[in-house]
């Protein structure tokens, strides 16, 4: 931040007076601020009457509210409960469900194994599950019992039946019960027949196999069929003639009997063990394994949680005749099935819970399932008595006793009457069981009308009677069936009918017709059942529920009428004695308060009118007039002074250009011309001297070595012949092996980059090549074909280290180790890796020393691609040692051509020295620039930020400063110790003249020492190379101090930095030097461009642009994809070509991009080095690094190559990809609007450029004369008597960084002028103002 100080002469009385005037102004400002302060007047009128009235009002309201408190509370807890009851009662009909389920077990049996249907039995169950009637009766009694007390109507209504309603709500769950009518078809013996069929099939197959193996087939055909064949025949005839017609007739009769006799319920129950005994008697005992598997499976299917043999939702919920009071909850989804389950709670359980009896001591009832089902409907009495238990136990035991006694009828059984005996026993057992069950349930139903005891007795009597009757009827039916089995030919026809596939196909039609008839019968039956249910179940329940609802609603209607009557009596008294007195008192108090407020406001408004009038007349108007007058006077004086200053500045500007600016410009132009001439002379001297060196080298070094190599080749020609013969023999052996194994070498895919290379050896592979492929063994040739190195971009299995040492360097991950390995690899190859090429050039380009172990044979030598100038003696010694060792080893081990060795060890190093020589000029310019930048102020930055920018701002405002500023400036210039001309001569002319004189000896010393050193040691090649390198190194070190050019160049540029305006392009010394050095570099680098290869071109461009060596692989990839390595390639088909701006050259750059980023002195787009240098500049400015180029980044990710992101002009609507690689791009609209100009300015700043508007006049830039005029301090001189002078002096310590600093300076100058003029007007004194 610039520092501006003001030094006043303490002995100057005028300055002291100015200070006093300044203090006076400050006091005036304070007084003005005091006058401008706001004046607040607070008027408070205290009305004691108002306060007292308010207290009286508060007291009346407080005391009156406490003295009389009347509350009317109506607490109605009944209405909501009754509404809930009413809603639930309305839902009762909607939730009634009628379910009809037909479970046909017969059809499933037919589909699986087509079993016999001889003893197929079907049972139908009609179950009306009425749980509502008893609940409704119980609710009616409960309501009648608990509503006798009614409602008590008071001023505060108290609901005495809240708990009663809550209990009623809990009881409403009974209304949610569901009615079910289930029709179940059960199959009882399908599994038994299935098991027997498998057994019979096994026996039949065994018999047939025995018959087929018998030789006497005719004799076997005459034999009678076995027992199994007879059974098949008997069963077939019996089924056709007797069984099936009897089953159809019996089913029809049973269905009619069920409908006529048992409308409410009929349960058929046959024990599985009874049927097991019957079928075992008929078909014989079964194996435990077979019966266990099938019977268990069938039982699991029939006895699941679905409720026995029924598949309807009710059975799934647990309401089935086979379950006893299972508790399932309605509307709660089970984990498996049963979405509609119903909670069933018997009446005994409810009564036990209400009475508080524990479950352990509660009486248990036993009996038939029908009795338990009807037990839920009973609402009065208890169902436990000793007599009932006795009868029920007896009735339950009778069927089983009858079943046991029936076994004694098996006495006298023989072959002829076995069917009759077994049939009578089975019929007796089944009939007794079924009759006992049905009779017990029917008797219990009839007895329930008498009471609980009647229910138990009726169930017992019904069970006994039903068992006897059923046993008698079952015995007769079984006897007839068994006799029919014995007398008919059923046994003979079983094998031919029941186990015959054709027989089954004929019978199936009859079975399906019968099943359809059964379904029709079920539909007719259900029609009658539903009519009966509506008549005898739903209508009675509905008729009972409606009066209950009406009764409850009527009770609450009477209660509400009572509440209304009481309120009609209370309301008149409340209005007369409470409401009217309170409202009147409140109205009077409010009227009094408002009247007092109105009177107070009238008094306040009158007082304020008087105060405001006085304030305006005595305070505001005098202050405002005084301030206005003072401001007008001050402004008029400032304008007068400003007019005088502006008239004087015109003369100042003319003097400044004539005496400061123009002399400096002329002197700098002369210096520029002189420097250019010296650089041209030096370049011409180098070119002329090199021609002599080349001639001498060919005469004294190249030609003798060629002759020596030819002689050596002649001496060792026999080795070549031996190698050819041995190699031919080895080749024949390998060829013979290929004929046997049929294995041949796969062709090696050469890198596309190598195809484009010239036949001229490259810098990096000269020392790695063999003298001739023909001089190598077969194994060495194979190794040489594989050991080519390369760049790995994806996972690969590779053969490494097969021909020597190799480095594997990671570049994406573990970059620290990669850099370390890269440095080691460069050291082994005689190269150096640097991150900053500028730092490398400043250090003289000292290379890494060549280790002795790096090249132990002439086949693996190393060389640097850059000319090493700091350690040539050591390198020359190493090269000589390698030559001697390699020469001896080549003679003793294998033949080596002298021509190849000469190219590798002599021609190539000196060629590299030629290509590296352009760096010398660059290093000199770089050191010169570094010397300038190393000054205390910094020439470029100092002149740009401290001189150019502030003076431009000063020029635009200098017309207002006045004559005093101009005269003080001129006097300060003239009073310096050195003066402008002397300063320029000392700090500009003499340093450059010294540089001119010194530069003449650089080339002569270099070439002279070089030639002398070569001539003195021409007799010995090894010593000559050493001395030559040493002379070259010494010349450069002594004359240029090239190992540290910054030291020499710093001394040259230190004194020339101050006063030289480097910011101007016309006199920019650094740019001029770079341009001259660049042209010199271009001249040298262009020597081998056409004859080189891609790698050499890119290496030269990398060195010219000071780019890291790590960019080489990426640049080679871009060159290969963009041009194929062809520097003359041009693209004539893309959008750039259509716009007249085709991409061309090695890196395929468009001319506009090339011109924007080309290196100094490299302006030929077809020159591959120039093209690559421009491409490198573009990559640096656009992407920052080679790794961020879209094509390189895409290839590293395993994707395709992507071309440049070049930007361009958009002339039509399109969809484009911008910002590739997350790099910034600017999109600027072409219209001349605020947005477009703003974006253009921002883009120029990002590119390090400036944007100017030609429509606006631009002030001319200041020359270096302005700089020298202000960089020297001066002392103020005494003013001439009778004159008035104001000195404003500047020196190099005054730094202006931005416009704000300049504006601050101008403001301070104007203030000083105003103060001085004001003082002169007031007191008439004369003084000097010194401002630094």
UniProtKB/Swiss-Prot annotation:
Residues 324-335 have a biased composition (Basic residues). It comes from the Bacteria. InterPro entries: Lysozyme-like_dom_sf, Transglycosylase_SLT_dom_1. Residues 202-222 have a biased composition (Basic and acidic residues). Residues 355-368 have a biased composition (Polar residues). This is Phage-like element PBSX protein XkdO. The lineage of its organism: Bacteria, Bacillati, Bacillota, Bacilli, Bacillales. Residues 202-225, 324-368, 744-771 are annotated as: Disordered. The gene is xkdO. To B.subtilis YqbO.
């Amino acid at each position: 931040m610039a520092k501006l100080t003001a030094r006043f002469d303490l002995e100057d009385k005028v300055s002291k007076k100015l200070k006093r005037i300044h203090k006076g102004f400050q006091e005036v400002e304070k007084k003005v601020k005091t006058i401008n302060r706001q004046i607040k007047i607070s008027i408070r009128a205290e009305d004691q009457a108002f306060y007292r009235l308010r207290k009286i009002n508060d007291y009346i309201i407080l005391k009156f509210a406490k003295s009389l408190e009347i509350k009317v509370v109506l607490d109605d807890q009944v209405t909501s409960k009754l509404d809930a009851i009413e809603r639930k009662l309305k839902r009762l009909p909607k939730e009634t469900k009628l379910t009809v389920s037909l479970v046909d077990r017969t059809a499933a049996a037919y589909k699986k194994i087509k079993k016999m249907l001889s003893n197929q039995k079907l049972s139908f169950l009609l179950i009306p599950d009425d749980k509502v009637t008893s609940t409704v009766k119980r609710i009616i009694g409960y309501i009648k019992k608990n509503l006798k007390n009614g409602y008590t109507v008071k001023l505060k209504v108290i609901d005495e039946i809240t708990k009663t309603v809550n209990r009623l709500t809990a009881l409403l769950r009974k209304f949610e019960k569901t009615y079910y009518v289930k029709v179940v078809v059960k199959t009882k013996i399908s599994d038994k027949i299935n098991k027997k069929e498998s057994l019979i099939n096994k026996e039949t197959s065994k018999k047939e196999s025995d018959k087929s193996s018998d030789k006497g087939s005719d004799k076997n055909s005459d034999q009678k069929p076995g027992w199994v064949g007879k059974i098949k025949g008997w069963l077939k005839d019996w089924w056709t003639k007797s069984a099936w017609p009897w089953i159809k007739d019996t089913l029809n009769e049973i269905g009619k009997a069920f409908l006529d006799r048992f409308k409410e319920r009929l349960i058929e129950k046959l024990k599985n063990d009874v049927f097991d005994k019957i079928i075992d008697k008929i078909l014989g005992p079964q194996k435990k394994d077979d019966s266990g598997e099938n019977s268990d499976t069938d039982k699991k299917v029939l006895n699941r949680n679905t409720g026995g043999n029924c598949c309807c939702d009710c059975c799934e919920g647990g309401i089935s005749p086979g379950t006893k009071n299972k508790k399932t909850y309605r509307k709660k989804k089970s984990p498996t099935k049963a979405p509609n389950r119903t909670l069933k709670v018997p009446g005994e359980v409810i009564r036990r819970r209400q009475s508080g009896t524990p479950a352990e001591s509660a009486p248990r009832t036993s009996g038939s399932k029908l009795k338990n089902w009807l037990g839920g409907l009973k609402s009065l009495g208890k169902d436990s008595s000793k007599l009932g238990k006795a009868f029920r136990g007896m009735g339950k035991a009778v069927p089983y006793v009858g079943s046991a006694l029936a076994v004694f009828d098996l006495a006298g059984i023989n072959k002829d009457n076995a069917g009759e005996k077994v049939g009578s026993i089975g019929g007796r057992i089944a009939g007794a069981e079924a009759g006992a069950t049905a009779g017990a349930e029917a008797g219990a139903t009839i007895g329930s009308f008498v009471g609980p005891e009647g229910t138990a007795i009726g169930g017992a009597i019904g069970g006994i009677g039903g068992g006897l009757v059923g046993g008698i009827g079952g015995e007769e039916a079984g006897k007839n069936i068994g006799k029919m089995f014995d007398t008919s030919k059923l046994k003979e026809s079983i094998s031919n009918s029941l186990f015959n596939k054709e027989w089954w196909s004929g019978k199936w039609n009859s079975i399906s017709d019968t099943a359809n008839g059964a379904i029709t019968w079920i539909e007719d039956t259900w029609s009658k059942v539903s009519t009966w249910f509506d008549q005898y179940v739903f209508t009675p329940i509905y008729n009972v529920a409606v009066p209950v609802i009406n009764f409850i609603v009527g009770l609450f209607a009477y209660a509400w009428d009572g509440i209304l009557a009481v309120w009609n009596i209370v309301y008149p008294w409340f209005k007369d004695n409470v409401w009217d007195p309170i409202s009147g008192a409140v109205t009077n108090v409010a009227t009094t308060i408002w009247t007092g407020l109105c009177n107070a406001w009238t008094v306040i408004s009158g007082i304020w009118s008087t105060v405001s009038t006085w304030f305006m007349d005595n305070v505001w108007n005098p202050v405002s007039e005084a301030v206005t007058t003072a401001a007008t006077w001050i402004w008029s004086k400032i304008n007068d002074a400003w007019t005088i200053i502006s008239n004087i500045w015109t003369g100042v500007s003319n003097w400044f250009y004539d005496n400061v600016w123009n002399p400096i410009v002329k002197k700098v132009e002369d210096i520029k011309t002189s420097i250019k001439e010296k650089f041209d002379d030096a370049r011409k001297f180098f070119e002329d001297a090199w021609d002599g060196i080349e001639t001498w080298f060919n005469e004294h070094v190249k030609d003798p070595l060629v002759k020596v190599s030819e002689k050596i080749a002649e001496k060792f020609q026999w080795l070549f012949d031996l190698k050819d013969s041995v190699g031919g023999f080895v080749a024949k052996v390998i060829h013979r092996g290929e004929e046997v194994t049929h294995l041949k070498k796969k062709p090696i895919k050469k890198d596309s980059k190598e195809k484009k290379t010239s036949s001229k050896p490259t810098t990096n592979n000269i020392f790695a090549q063999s003298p001739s492929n023909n001089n190598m063994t077969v194994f060495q040739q194979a190794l040489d074909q594989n050991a080519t190195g390369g760049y790995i971009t994806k996972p690969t299995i590779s053969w490494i280290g097969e021909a020597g040492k190799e480095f594997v360097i990671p570049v994406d991950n573990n970059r620290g180790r990669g850099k370390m390995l890269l440095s080691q690899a460069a050291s082994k190859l005689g190269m150096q890796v640097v991150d900053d090429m500028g730092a490398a050039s400043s250090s003289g380009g000292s290379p890494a020393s060549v280790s002795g172990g790096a090249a132990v044979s002439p086949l693996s030598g190393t060389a640097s691609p850059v000319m090493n100038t700091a350690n040539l003696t050591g390198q020359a010694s190493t090269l000589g040692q390698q030559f001697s060792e390699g020469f001896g080893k080549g003679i003793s081990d294998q033949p080596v051509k002298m021509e190849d060795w000469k190219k590798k060890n002599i021609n190539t190093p000196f060629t590299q020295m030629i290509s590296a020589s352009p760096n010398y000029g660059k290093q000199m310019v770089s050191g010169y620039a570094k010397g300038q930048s190393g000054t205390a102020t910094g020439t470029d930055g100092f002149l740009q930020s401290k001189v150019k920018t502030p003076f431009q701002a000063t020029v635009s405002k200098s017309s207002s400063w006045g004559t005093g500023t101009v005269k003080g400036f001129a006097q300060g210039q003239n009073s310096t110790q050195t003066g402008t001309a002397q300063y320029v001569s000392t700090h500009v002319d003499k340093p450059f003249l010294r540089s001119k004189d010194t530069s003449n000896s650089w080339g002569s010393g270099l070439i002279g020492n070089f030639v002398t050193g070569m001539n003195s040691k021409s007799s010995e090649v090894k010593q000559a190379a050493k001395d030559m390198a040493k002379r070259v190194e010494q010349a450069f070190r002594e004359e240029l101090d090239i190992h540290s050019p910054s030291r020499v160049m710093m001394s040259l540029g230190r004194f020339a930095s101050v006063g030289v305006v480097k910011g101007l392009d016309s006199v920019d010394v650094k740019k001029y030097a770079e341009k001259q050095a660049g042209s010199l570099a271009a001249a040298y680098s262009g020597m081998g461009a056409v004859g080189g290869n891609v790698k050499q071109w890119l290496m030269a461009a990398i060195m010219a642009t000071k780019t890291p060596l790590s960019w080489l692989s990426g640049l080679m990839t871009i060159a290969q994809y963009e041009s194929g390595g062809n520097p003359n390639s041009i693209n004539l088909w893309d959008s750039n070509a259509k716009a007249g701006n085709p991409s061309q050259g090695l890196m395929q750059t468009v001319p506009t991009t090339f011109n924007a980023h080309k290196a100094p002195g490299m302006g030929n787009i077809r020159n591959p080095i120039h093209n690559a240098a421009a491409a490198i500049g573009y990559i640096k400015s656009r992407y920052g690094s080679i790794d961020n180029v879209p094509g390189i980044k895409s290839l590293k990710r395993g994707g395709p190559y992507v071309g440049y992101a070049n930007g361009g002009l958009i002339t039509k609507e399109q969809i484009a990809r911008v910002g590739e690689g997350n790099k910034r791009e600017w999109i600027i609209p072409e219209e001349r609007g605020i947005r477009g100009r703003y974006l253009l300015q921002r883009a120029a700043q990002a590119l390090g450029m400036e944007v100017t508007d030609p429509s606006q006049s631009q002030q001319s830039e200041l020359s270096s004369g302005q700089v020298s005029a202000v960089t020297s301090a001066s002392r103020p001189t005494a003013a001439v008597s009778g004159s008035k002078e104001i000195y404003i002096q500047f020196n190099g310590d005054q730094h202006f960084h931005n416009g704000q600093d300049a504006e601050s300076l101008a403001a301070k100058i104007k203030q000083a002028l105003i103060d001085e003029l004001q003082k002169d007007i007031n007191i008439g004194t004369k003084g000097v103002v010194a401002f630094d």
